[in-house]
């Protein structure tokens, strides 16, 4: 496991490369994180997923988008277009590190959207995994707004700071989504376009949801699409006083099993 900086010298991205721990596959994996508190909750799960895939012989790269985590940049200046481009930069870096001929993209929540968008313009993405994906950006934003509006003052500690600002920025669970980013996220629709250039697709969901079903119905026209319902913990945006993480083993194991099975 090797931390690294990649991309341009002016705006480097932070990533972690997991080299294969078994006979190397001729395919690498880029893991695309979710955003905000979901990133914090999912960090350990994505790390474990990367370690398990490395044990199956995959080169794996997980990374932080511009303006998030340990990457350079300011969240105020980030855009969906930039984060989609970051996925492309991660693909390039992984291919340089490993000399693999193709890549697989695994995205969780909003990361699933960025992975899918990045795959549309490429011919080297062999597999795409969308895990509990955000299907409608508008619904995603509305859910955050409901959580903010429903919050009650804390009895046991200081106020959380969750609020919606006049410019549209959302402050939720310690993270800020600037108004410009919120507006671009609201326009996202994962079911609007089938990623036809991808060789194989797995939609893995840990709970039943009408938007998941809508995506399944839109993407099932792909000849190598698989929908998998694997019950697992899925409250990605929950936060408690102990900084709880989410480690949904059934979902992680399901993705690893599919990746291993689908390897040529």
What are these regions (language model features)?
Residues 106-115, 132:
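Gly/Ala-rich beta-loop-alpha elbow adjacent to hydrolase catalytic centers
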Residues 122-261:
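The alpha/beta-hydrolase serine catalytic core
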Residues 68-102:
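Catalytic nucleophile-loop/oxyanion-hole region of alpha/beta-hydrolase
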Residues 19-64:
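Short, surface-exposed "cap/lid" segments of acyl-processing enzymes
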Residues 1-27:
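N-terminal cap/lid segment of alpha/beta-hydrolase-fold proteins
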Residues 117-121:
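Active-site signature of alpha/beta-hydrolase-fold catalytic machinery across serine-
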Residues 36, 65-70, 135:
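Alpha/beta-hydrolase active-site loop signature
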Residues 5, 15-16, 54, 61-63, ...:
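Terminal, non-globular segments
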């Amino acid at each position: 496991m090797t931390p690294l900086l990649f991309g341009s010298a002016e705006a480097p991205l932070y990533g972690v490369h997991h080299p294969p721990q078994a006979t190397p596959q001729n395919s690498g994996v880029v893991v695309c994180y979710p955003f905000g508190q979901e990133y914090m909750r999912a960090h350990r799960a994505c790390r474990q997923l990367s370690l398990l895939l490395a044990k199956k012989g995959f080169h794996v790269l997980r990374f932080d988008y511009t303006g998030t985590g340990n990457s350079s940049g300011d969240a105020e200046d980030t855009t969906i277009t930039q984060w989609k481009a970051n996925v492309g930069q991660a693909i390039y870096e992984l291919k340089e590190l490993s000399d693999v001929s193709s890549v697989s993209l695994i995205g969780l929540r909003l990361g699933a959207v960025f992975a899918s968008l990045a795959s549309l313009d490429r011919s080297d993405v062999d597999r795409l995994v969308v895990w509990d994906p955000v299907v409608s950006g508008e619904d995603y934003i509305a859910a955050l707004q409901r959580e903010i509006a429903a919050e009650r003052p804390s009895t046991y500690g200081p106020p959380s700071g969750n609020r919606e600002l006049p410019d549209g920025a959302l402050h939720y669970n310690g993270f800020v989504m600037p108004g410009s980013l919120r507006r671009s996220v609201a326009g996202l629709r994962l079911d609007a376009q089938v990623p036809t250039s991808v060789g194989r697709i797995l939609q893995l969901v840990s709970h039943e949801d009408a938007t998941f079903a809508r995506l399944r119905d839109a993407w099932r026209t792909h000849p190598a699409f698989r929908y998998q319902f694997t019950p697992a913990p899925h409250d990605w945006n929950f936060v408690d006083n102990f900084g709880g993480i989410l480690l949904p083993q059934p979902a992680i194991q399901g993705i690893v099993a599919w990746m291993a099975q689908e390897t040529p």
